[in-house]
Amino acid sequence: MVPSEIPQLSDAFKNEATAQNYIMGNVYGYIPTESSIAENPALLSTDELDIPWRNDKTNFKAYHINLGTLDTSSPYFNLWEGANGSKALYKGIREAYVFLENIDQVPDLDVAKKARWIAEAHFLIGYYHFCLLRQYGPIIVARNSVDMNAPEEQRYPRR
C-alpha cells in the first residue's frame, strides 16, 4: 500500500503544467554540459590547451585526463552510470520513453504542443544515443522503456 501523499507517475501527467515539468526536468535534465570548459573532454584533454588559472579548488575533469589520472574503474566522463558528476544517459533515454508512453494521459493538451513535445522527446532519445555512441563505440539502442520488474531477458537485451 502506498501512502496517498507520495506522488505517482500518473501525477506527472494530470495536466499540462505537470507534463511540462516532467519533460523539462526528467527528459531535458540529462543533457550533458558540453559547453563548459570543465565538462568537455575535447577541450582540456589535449596538449594544445592549458588552463593557467587552475588551482586545487577547481575540478576540471578533462584536465585530469591530461595529468594521467584517468582510470577504468572511475572514469571522469561516465555517461553510462552517471558517476563523477556526469549524467547517466540511459536513464535519460528511459525518462523520454516514459514521457512518450504517458503523454496521451494529459487532458486538454494542445495538439501542436503535444506534437512538439513528442518530437523533442524523440530528438533527445537520438541525441543521448549519439552521445553514448561517441563516447563508447557500439552500444545497445533502447527502443522503449523497460519495466524494472520484467524478466532479465527483457531488461538486458542482446545486440
Predicted regions and their residues:
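Proline-centered turn/helix-capping motifs that create local helix->coil transitions or kinks
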Residues: M1, S35-S36, L132-V141
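Membrane-proximal, proline-rich intrinsically disordered regions
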Residues: M1-S45
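Short linear capping/connector segments at secondary-structure termini
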Residues: E5-Q8, R143-P151
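Short clusters of hydrophobic/aromatic residues that line enzyme substrate/ligand-binding pockets
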Residues: F13, L70, V141
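Conserved, well-structured interaction surfaces
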Residues: E16, N21, G29-T33, N59-Y136, ...
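Short, solvent-exposed loop/turn elements at domain surfaces
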Residues: T33-P41, D50-N55, F60-A62
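Short, hydrophobic secondary-structure boundary micro-motifs
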Residues: E39-N40, L109, V141-N144
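Acidic helix-start/capping segments at beta-turn-to-alpha-helix junctions
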Residues: L44-L49, W117
